[in-house]
Amino acid sequence: MVMIAETSEADTRERVVATAERLFREIGYQKTTVADIARLLRMSPANVYRFFDSKRAIYEAVATRLMGEVETAATAIAFETDAPDTRLRRLLSAIHHMNAERYTGDEKIHHMVAMAIEEDWEVCNAHFERITGIVAKVIDDGARQGVFATPDVSLAAMTVTTAMTRFFHPQVIAQCAAKPGPSLDQMVDFVLAALSPRLPAR
C-alpha cells in the first residue's frame, strides 16, 4: 500500500513538472502561475503545493529534468565500447547539440536557464559537476589505454569542460553564435590533441 502511494506521488510530481515545462515553453516561466499548472492538471493550487513548496522549486525541477536528459545521453556515450578518443569527440559534440537544442533553440526556456545560471542555482552547479565527471570517465579510460596522457584526470576533465564553454554554456552558445571563433569540430580537435601523448622530440 505504501509503495502504491509513493508511486502515485512520484507520478503526480512528474506530471506537475511536465506540465510546467510545457507552459514555460508556451508562455514563458515568468507568466506561468501555479494556478495555470493546477488548472491543466485539474487539481487545486494547494494540491500542487503538496509536492512543491514554491514556484522556485518547480523551476528547479524543470531545470533538473532538462539537464537530466543531457546527463543521461552523455552517460550512455561515455559507457560505449568505442575507442576513448572517438567517445570523447562524440560526447563533447552531443553535449553541445543537446544544450543548443534545449536552451538556445527555445527562447522562453533559455530565459529560465539564464536566470538559473545567473542566480547560481544548486541544480546548475550539480549538473556541471556531473558533466565534468562524465567527461572524466572517458578521459580516465583513455589514460588507462594509452590514448590520452594526463597525470591528473580530474584536472584534465575540468580543463576540457572549461575549454568547451563556448559550446556548452547556454548563454555563451547564444551570445557567440554569430561571432568569429573556432568551429565545434576545430575545438574538439584541439582538446583531443591536448590530451594525446606527445611524440618524442627528434
Stretch-by-stretch model annotation:
Residues 90, 96-136, 144:
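Short secondary-structure transition hinges
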